[in-house]
């Protein structure tokens, strides 16, 4: 059998440990505030306080390998846009930002279609594209390899990447 009072020692040790844990829990907020870490501190700033420097904006964080394991990268599919609707100024964006709206869209109440600057050569290309689009499909960020010919959509189909899973919360209106 055990020694007399052995059960009391364990109970006393457990009680003291429990009191220390509760005390540390109550004092934890004071410890973190004195270190400069508040509940509103971003993970990037907390990491900087702990490691002594702020990571660069594009530098992976300490937890990024774990984040990549938990959440796989987004899968994209290509979508061809053959018609771009006019938009009202001041309305929300129906897709992620690609550039100035007027690069692709006509504004309701703005300049009319065909009022964009174009060279005579560009005007001929635009007129020929009314029957069948002459240009190859392009990305929205493609640089113009020819003289100005009005809006790109008149001669080219625009190819965009659309996420397969709509986790991002962006409502795609295409």
From Swiss-Prot:
GO MF term list: metal ion binding; oxidoreductase activity
Q: Which domain of life is it from?
A: Bacteria
Induction text: Part of the probable 17 gene mamAB operon.
Q: Which regions face the Cytoplasmic side of the membrane?
A: 1-9
The transmembrane segments are: 10-28
Q: Which cofactor does it need?
A: heme
Binding, heme 1 = 101, 104-105
Lumenal-side stretches of the chain, per the record, are: 29-174
Result of knocking out the encoding gene: Normal magnetic response, slightly smaller, irregularly spaced magnetosomes. Near wild-type localization of MamC. Deletion of approximately 80 kb of DNA, including this operon, leads to cells that are non-magnetic, lack internal membrane systems, grow poorly, have reduced mobility and take-up and accumulate iron poorly.
Where along the chain is heme 2 bound?
152, 155-156
Keyword Ligase: yes or no? no
Keywords of this entry: Biomineralization, Heme, Iron, Magnetosome, Membrane, Metal-binding, Oxidoreductase, Transmembrane, Transmembrane helix
Q: What else is known?
A: This bacteria makes up to 60 cubo-octahedral magnetosomes of about 45 nm in diameter which contain membrane-bound crystals of magnetite (Fe(3)O(4)). Expression of just the minimal mamAB gene cluster (MGMSRv2__2365 to MGMSRv2__2381), including this gene, is sufficient to form a minimal magnetosome chain with small magnetite particles.
Described function: May play a role in magnetite crystal maturation. May transfer electrons to balance the Fe(2+)-Fe(3+) ratio during magnetite formation.
Q: Which family is this sequence assigned to?
A: Belongs to the magnetosome MamT family.
Protein name from the UniProt record: Magnetosome protein MamT
The source organism is Magnetospirillum gryphiswaldense (strain DSM 6361 / JCM 21280 / NBRC 15271 / MSR-1)
